[in-house]
From Swiss-Prot:
<protein>
    <recommendedName>
        <fullName>LIM domain-binding protein 1-A</fullName>
    </recommendedName>
</protein>
<comment type="function">
    <text>Binds to the LIM domain of a wide variety of LIM domain-containing transcription factors.</text>
</comment>
<dbReference type="GO" id="GO:0003712">
    <property type="term" value="F:transcription coregulator activity"/>
</dbReference>
<dbReference type="GO" id="GO:0030274">
    <property type="term" value="F:LIM domain binding"/>
</dbReference>
<keyword id="KW-0539">Nucleus</keyword>
<dbReference type="GO" id="GO:0045944">
    <property type="term" value="P:positive regulation of transcription by RNA polymerase II"/>
</dbReference>
<comment type="similarity">
    <text>Belongs to the LDB family.</text>
</comment>
<dbReference type="GO" id="GO:0005667">
    <property type="term" value="C:transcription regulator complex"/>
</dbReference>
<dbReference type="GO" id="GO:0007399">
    <property type="term" value="P:nervous system development"/>
</dbReference>
<feature type="region of interest" description="Disordered">
    <location>
        <begin position="322"/>
        <end position="374"/>
    </location>
</feature>
<feature type="compositionally biased region" description="Polar residues">
    <location>
        <begin position="341"/>
        <end position="374"/>
    </location>
</feature>
<feature type="compositionally biased region" description="Low complexity">
    <location>
        <begin position="267"/>
        <end position="297"/>
    </location>
</feature>
<dbReference type="GO" id="GO:0005634">
    <property type="term" value="C:nucleus"/>
</dbReference>
<dbReference type="GO" id="GO:0000122">
    <property type="term" value="P:negative regulation of transcription by RNA polymerase II"/>
</dbReference>
<dbReference type="Pfam" id="PF01803">
    <property type="entry name" value="LIM_bind"/>
</dbReference>
<feature type="domain" description="LIM interaction domain (LID)">
    <location>
        <begin position="299"/>
        <end position="338"/>
    </location>
</feature>
<feature type="region of interest" description="Disordered">
    <location>
        <begin position="1"/>
        <end position="24"/>
    </location>
</feature>
Length: 374
């Protein structure tokens, strides 16, 4: 038997699955259920018991220590934007009830939940803040706008960012109240007037205006509470520290060490070509045929490979490229050497290429003999 079968059925939001039905955790890190818990906690508000400690405990349960709450709306004199920190958030919710509200809750339609690295965002374009006002007269105020929340992605799921952008509001008066004062024109005229401005009571608006002064003074208040200094000394200390931050030289960016290029090394072929002939003959048997070609130092080139972001090449990108040309047809490569030419197989004893042309002196000696024979 489930617990819900014993007592009265508790209220759950539409997207929440009741405990015991395929779920082990109370709310499974659902952001909309956190809003449901916030509404349930606000329903426990009573004018006698809810003091500063109660509101501070409420804020600690649902808001992070560095939380920021932002309210934006538009009045007759232009758009307004108020941002308060964690210290001033409890008084904001308390000002709503001090303005005549007896009930406060938020209704979210089609919220969008997104997961990020360390937080979960909830974006609801159709959010309605509903307040039941008992004074100066019974009126229900519906404030429509967009609510954007950021919850820390941990077990507590507390709010770090609260941003409520108000678009419009409606004030609803029950028909029974109108029927009671149907014969009183003065009362009907009073009922036709709005009791809020853009859905916010005068108490809340005055507190938000006061927060414009209180929010920058949070540093002074914290220093006064921590060090027990006088307000004048706190102001002097804060101003001096701010002045130090302003006149401090900007931090120099870390300089990158210049890329050192490697020295070009001479190739082994060029060293061998500059040596004596004896060394060439003795090492010719040990060298491979590919290394027997003479290389000059001008054939060594450094090629820069393209790197990311258009940077220049460095030590890691340098390459030594040796260019090997076919020097067999080079006249300076010793192909005209007589000794190597005579050792060719084509220059054998019986080869017709072996007979040398008669010299000019021998031709002169043969001419007299030929004449005498005649």
């Amino acid at each position: 038997m489930l617990d819900r079968d014993v007592g009265p059925t508790p209220m759950y939001p539409p997207s929440y699955m009741e405990p015991g039905i395929g779920r082990h955790t109370p709310y499974g890190n659902q952001t909309d259920y956190r809003i449901f818990e916030l509404n349930k906690r606000l329903q426990n508000w009573t004018e006698q018991d809810c003091d500063n400690l109660w509101w501070d405990a409420f804020t600690t349960e649902f808001f992070e220590d560095d939380a920021m709450l932002t309210i934006t709306f538009c009045l007759e004199d232009g758009p307004k934007r108020y941002t308060i920190g964690r210290t001033l958030i409890p008084r904001y919710f308390r000002s709503i009830f001090e303005g005549g509200a007896t009930e406060l809750f938020y209704v979210l339609k089609h919220p969008k939940e997104s997961f990020h690295n360390n937080f979960v965002s909830l974006d609801c374009d159709q959010c309605t803040m509903v307040t039941q006002n008992g004074k100066p007269m019974f009126t229900q105020v519906c404030v429509e706008g967009r609510l954007y929340l950021e919850f820390m992605f941990d077990d507590m799921m507390r709010i770090k960012t609260w941003h409520f952008s108000i678009r419009q509001h409606r004030e609803v008066v029950p028909r029974s109240i109108l029927a009671m004062h149907a014969q009183d024109p003065q009362m009907l005229d009073q009922l036709s007037k709005n009791i809020t401005r853009c859905g916010l009571s005068n108490s809340t608006l005055n507190y938000l205006r006061l927060c414009v002064i209180l929010e920058p003074m949070q540093e002074l208040m914290s220093r006064h509470k921590t060090y027990s200094l006088s307000p004048r000394d706190c102001l002097k200390t804060c101003l001096f520290q701010k002045w130090q931050r302003m006149v401090a030289p900007p931090a120099e960016p870390a300089r990158q060490a210049p890329n050192k290029r490697r020295k070009r090394k001479m190739s082994g072929g060029s060293t061998m070509s500059s040596g004596g002939g004896n060394n060439n003959n003795s090492n010719s048997k040990k060298k491979s045929p590919a290394s027997s070609f003479a290389l000059s130092s001008q054939d060594v080139m450094v090629v820069g490979e393209p790197t990311l972001m258009g940077g220049e090449f460095g030590d890691e990108d340098e390459r030594l490229i040796t260019r090997l040309e076919n020097t067999q047809f080079d006249a300076a490569n010793g192909i005209d050497d007589e000794d190597s030419f005579n050792s060719s197989p084509t220059m054998g004893t019986n080869s017709p290429w072996n007979s040398k042309a008669p010299s000019s002196q021998q031709g002169k000696n043969d001419n007299p003999s030929s004449q005498s024979s005649q």
